[in-house]
Amino acid sequence: MSLFDWFANRRKSSQDPQQRPEREIADGLWIKCEACGTLTYTKDLQANQMVCPECTHHIRVSSEQRIQQLIDFNTWVPIDPELRATDPLKFSDRKPYSDRLLEYQRKTGLPDAVQTGIGNIETEPVALGVMDFGFMGGSMGSVVGEKLTRLIEKATQESLPVIIICASGGARMQEGLLSLMQMAKISGALEQHREAKQLYIPILTHPTTGGVTASFAMLGDIIIAEPKATIGFAGRRVIEQTVREKLPENFQTSEYLLKHGFIDAIVPRTQLKKTLVKLIRLHKPHSLTLISDESLETGPHCHLPFQAESHNLSTTDNKIQPTPQG
């Protein structure tokens, strides 16, 4: 073959798509936003707390990522990290419950659907529980209930604020009444925590539904939600079939709940850590620090009922009180 023929064949193969070798792109290098379809470099997305830079869609993250986003480096101490569920009911649907547990444990690297522990947020110690939707839809079984209850009890003993990040489809059907009773158990622990005058902040993420919504998700002193999160008890179709009415488009969203007074604030993930620190410091015992307008600024996408444009706070007679406008 002459040199001319070699170059001719080379040019022909480069123009033929079937002859052109495929470029290999490393897995996980780019992430596509499920809301707007934008491809974003994974490291850039992680630096933005897994919030799409184009449409601000909050991409679902694991419990491990949540802990890394909130807790100061090298301060996380897990509680009961190896607590695992058994199968006392010998439940089986398409597969035995015990097999399903093993499947999700291998898939996520977690023993169950929640991580709990003690750590610092900007040097402030907190008791943190983080539900993981990747483990059986974040469903609440006996292990989830037990770990959260122990976390709250430890926080009560050590006078720590409790923060629980909720992401759940509700009670775990494979555990029947053992799952449902966790609602009352966690709620009872939270009542003791409240009587000890300690702070509890639930953070509702997409989705927070079922028995979790009907119990500890809605028992906070201050209830925070991420933007556009689905929050509710029964599903939309079930409600529409029951009431025989068409529901609003934004029904069961965090924005709808804020408008109707069911939650206290919508805070973007990128501003969550800063907001939590301010709330924790504001609720410290004997804290009478003057809260300035600047310290309450949270950003254009953060909806707080106590933002500076709504109230100026001042101290009078050893109490923090709203100052009349004008």
Curated annotation (Swiss-Prot):
It catalyses: N(6)-carboxybiotinyl-L-lysyl-[protein] + acetyl-CoA = N(6)-biotinyl-L-lysyl-[protein] + malonyl-CoA. GO terms for biological process: fatty acid biosynthetic process; malonyl-CoA biosynthetic process. One of its GO terms (molecular function) is zinc ion binding. Residues 302-326 are annotated as: Disordered. Keywords: ATP-binding, Cytoplasm, Fatty acid biosynthesis, Fatty acid metabolism, Lipid biosynthesis, Lipid metabolism, Metal-binding, Nucleotide-binding, Transferase, Zinc, Zinc-finger. Binds 1 zinc ion per subunit. Residues 309-326 have a biased composition (Polar residues). It holds the Pfam family Carboxyl_trans. Its EC number is 2.1.3.15. Pathway: Lipid metabolism; malonyl-CoA biosynthesis; malonyl-CoA from acetyl-CoA: step 1/1. Zn(2+) binds at C33, C36, C52, C55. It is an enzyme of class 2 (transferase). It is found in: Cytoplasm. GO terms for cellular component: acetyl-CoA carboxylase complex. Belongs to the AccD/PCCB family. Component of the acetyl coenzyme A carboxylase (ACC) complex. Biotin carboxylase (BC) catalyzes the carboxylation of biotin on its carrier protein (BCCP) and then the CO(2) group is transferred by the transcarboxylase to acetyl-CoA to form malonyl-CoA. Acetyl-CoA carboxylase is a heterohexamer composed of biotin carboxyl carrier protein (AccB), biotin carboxylase (AccC) and two subunits each of ACCase subunit alpha (AccA) and ACCase subunit beta (AccD). This is Acetyl-coenzyme A carboxylase carboxyl transferase subunit beta.
